[in-house]
């Protein structure tokens, strides 16, 4: 477990409060539609927070990391676009308005969401010994576990919805395959993400979706 400074602990408390307000906002019928509009902003703020606390953001030699995450963003977005169009990858689904403007039915922010998930799960295991388990297996499994919860809540937040309101098994399989591909590439490129806020933010986001799910 990382050790946190007083300022870092204060930031973690603020993050928890913001997401707690978000849970209440989505649960209360009167405020639900207003909080749906804030989803893109929260995603962008989460990325900004991670960039700010990234241990290596001011160091040189970051070209590999920049290229890797540009690839994750582009590939993630294009795969989702193809998935929406064909239904062959994840199953039959459509994006709502929860993630903002769309290009050919797919919001560009979903590419940033892939970046966020790869970065978070990478940074959580980076402090541990570098091997295939910590570099690829555990981060990928963590992503699939996160998706298992998020998929149950996404329609309620108007992020996306599934045909017949059923999340197909192939969605989780595809999430796992993409997670392994991205993390394998990251591992081979020796991209290391060190961020003290990665674990707290991941836990808070997971609890956010879980609490909304349990409120149904």
Predicted regions and their residues:
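Aromatic-rich, lipid-facing transmembrane alpha helices and their immediate juxtamembrane interface loops
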Residues: 1-216
